[in-house]
């Protein structure tokens, strides 16, 4: 009969005490929250350590660095079209002859550029000047006809223009290496030595009239030698001429030229007369220069000299 009696209702304020708070419900899900703390728990990484050890590569505080300008890839042009080369690229395609031709034409059209080019260009050296003369010499010999008489009038007419080109270049380069334009006599002598050697290699022709150009070039070369020798004699008493062996070199050039440089040889001999030539020094190397000293030490000095008697 008691079972048929209704259960009295529970007051509403009892339901509020039965609800769990969110904090307690979350803490109840942690399995380690209901167990005792152990010693090994001190060595386990915490959530804070895990968050600090994470890589900051994706952090917004470190924006990605841009690539350097040299590594940036050029974007293709949307519309490609033909265009001329820049000046630097155009000059790279020109060889020496083409570049010389362009520069010469510019100086002809604009004369004020000629002075600028002369002051800007480096001073030509002896080797560069002799190389130009050797190029003219090679062009001359390559134009001599093969077979037959190489010193005939026909051969001369074939190479006459090359002879003119070589002699014109020789007459232009030689004053450049003469004083006062060239202050170093050693440089001037070195150029004259090489230029005279190139002049020797000009062929001799059967017709004497065809040799007038070469003979005139020898006369001009002799004047150049005389000018440099006199200038060198003013500096240090001509010591450079003495110990450079230039007397032997010039004598050899004069012999090869058939005596056409004799005037230069005479001027050199007069400048070296007071000290003797290098040949005289080489001949006197075998003489005992200490013979007077030996006579003084042995007491025989002046034994062969007559003794003067009377008042001095």
Swiss-Prot record:
The gene is STS1. It holds the Pfam family Cut8. It is found in: Cytoplasm; Nucleus. Belongs to the cut8/STS1 family. Residues 38-51 have a biased composition (Basic and acidic residues). This is Tethering factor for nuclear proteasome STS1. PANTHER family: FI02826P. One of its GO terms (cellular component) is cytoplasm. Residues 21-32 have a biased composition (Low complexity). One of its GO terms (molecular function) is proteasome binding. It comes from the Eukaryota. Keywords: Cytoplasm, Nucleus, Protein transport, Transport. Residues 1-84 are annotated as: Disordered. GO terms for biological process: nuclear protein quality control by the ubiquitin-proteasome system; proteasome localization; protein transport.
